[in-house]
């Protein structure tokens, strides 16, 4: 069932993205897509759970226990929906603040990475070119041996392996040479990028200590607000479950007593 729900959810989300494309609307943010997926999944589970409850109450055991689960199901679903509505805005604000606080650092790092990429790209292209040349040379040397294998007999297999071994070692050694050369070319840029990152983080730590402390306080405040808003809804959910559990307990004890009486009379 979960696989079907997730499949429908994916179709729903991709369909919503296609609608934005054709109507030229603003695309959904990742957070909105996650919320849509969670909503579809929760609604599907809720509807499926209600069907299972209805089937159970219609069964012989359900009629005998008389739990009246279906009467409480809609109120529980409403409580869960209320909890989701209360938590949603607080969580959204928390992630928006996190993204806003790290925007400058992400932009600076993207700029540094793009600069390093432009500098090392020629070395990467040269390495790829040489590697393709080595592979092609190896293929040309091995191709006659493959033909010899197809045309020859099994007794020449050992001889063929002996011929392949030095060629493989030669390719490995030549590739190692190219890799070492590439590593030597890239080392200064790697060190430079690491130093820039350390500088950015140090500047953020020293110059933005006040903003970081403020953000920490805001994050704590948001989490505290989230906890406070969730408490009433969770309490409502607990109160909604109590009648169901109590009814189940009473009905189960009654069924056990009735079964014991029947056994005693037999």
From Swiss-Prot:
Modification note: Glycosylated.
Sequence repeat residue intervals: 67-88, 89-110, 111-121, 122-143, 144-165, 166-187, 188-209, 210-231, 232-242, 243-266
GO biological process annotation, one example: positive regulation of phospholipid efflux
Region 10 X approximate tandem repeats, residue ranges: 67-266
Methionine sulfoxide carried by residues: 109
UniProt keyword list: Cholesterol metabolism, HDL, Lipid metabolism, Lipid transport, Lipoprotein, Oxidation, Palmitate, Phosphoprotein, Repeat, Secreted, Signal, Steroid metabolism, Sterol metabolism, Transport
Annotated signal peptide: 1-18
GO cellular component: chylomicron; extracellular vesicle; high-density lipoprotein particle; low-density lipoprotein particle; very-low-density lipoprotein particle
Gene Ontology molecular function, alphabetical: cholesterol transfer activity; phosphatidylcholine-sterol O-acyltransferase activator activity; phospholipid binding; protein homodimerization activity
Keyword Repeat carried by entry: yes
Family, as annotated: Belongs to the apolipoprotein A1/A4/E family.
Subunit organization: Homodimer. Interacts with APOA1BP and CLU. Component of a sperm activating protein complex (SPAP), consisting of APOA1, an immunoglobulin heavy chain, an immunoglobulin light chain and albumin. Interacts with NDRG1. Interacts with SCGB3A2. Interacts with NAXE and YJEFN3.
Protein name stated in the entry: Apolipoprotein A-I
Protein species of origin: Mustela putorius furo
